[in-house]
Amino acid sequence: MFQVEMTASVREAFGKGPMRRLRQQGITPAVVYGAGKAALPLQMDAKILMTQLLEFSRVNTVVSLSVDGQDAKNVVIAEIQSDPVTDALVHVDFCEIDLDQAREFTVPVTFEGTPKGVDLGGRLESHLTSVILKAKPLDIPNEFVINIADLAIDEQLTVADVALAENVVMVTPAARVMVAVLK
């Protein structure tokens, strides 16, 4: 899992009008919640935030978030709201996490190679683009890259065929078909 550092400051403005003015000034409203604590309203520089979000392409990432220079909180991005027309950031929700506690994460799956069954006239069907894993946040892989070059016609790859580290548990049902080569 990726790790990045970000900074923010406590937000004093609330409501629709003040939020709009913040965004016009290049500031993105945000909030941190979780761990049984009250939600903490934040504000972040929109350009810096967007640059950092693009670095890790909005995938599973542990963010070390420093608020007003205090000790950093370990958070994950729970939700990113963006304008549907301009794609500008509207709001970011962070969820505080404990790095020693297992959680569920959705991990993307990509397939590489051309199955030999496709070369022989078969048709490739991809059924899953991600799987759900449960583990400590720093033990979660960034993605699964699975080589499917050896798949012949009428063969399939299931979730059970994915090799995992011993401290990572697959939540997605083992019988689910990930990819298959059909006639």
From Swiss-Prot:
Q: Which domain of life is it from?
A: Bacteria
Keyword match RNA-binding: yes
Per the UniProt record, one Pfam family is Ribosomal_L25p
Keywords for this entry? Ribonucleoprotein, Ribosomal protein, RNA-binding, rRNA-binding
Q: Which InterPro entries match?
A: Rbsml_bL25/Gln-tRNA_synth_N, Ribosomal_bL25/Gln-tRNA_synth, Ribosomal_bL25_b-dom, Ribosomal_bL25_C, Ribosomal_bL25_long, Ribosomal_L25_dom, Ribosomal_uL5_bac-type
One of the GO biological process terms? translation
Q: Which GO terms describe its cellular component?
A: cytosolic large ribosomal subunit
The record describes its quaternary structure and partners as: Part of the 50S ribosomal subunit; part of the 5S rRNA/L5/L18/L25 subcomplex. Contacts the 5S rRNA. Binds to the 5S rRNA independently of L5 and L18.
Which PANTHER family is this protein grouped with? RIBOSOMAL PROTEIN L25/GLN-TRNA SYNTHETASE, ANTI-CODON-BINDING DOMAIN-CONTAINING PROTEIN (PTHR33284), RIBOSOMAL PROTEIN L25_GLN-TRNA SYNTHETASE, ANTI-CODON-BINDING DOMAIN-CONTAINING PROTEIN (PTHR33284:SF1)
The protein's name is Large ribosomal subunit protein bL25
Q: Which organism is it from?
A: Desulfotalea psychrophila (strain LSv54 / DSM 12343)
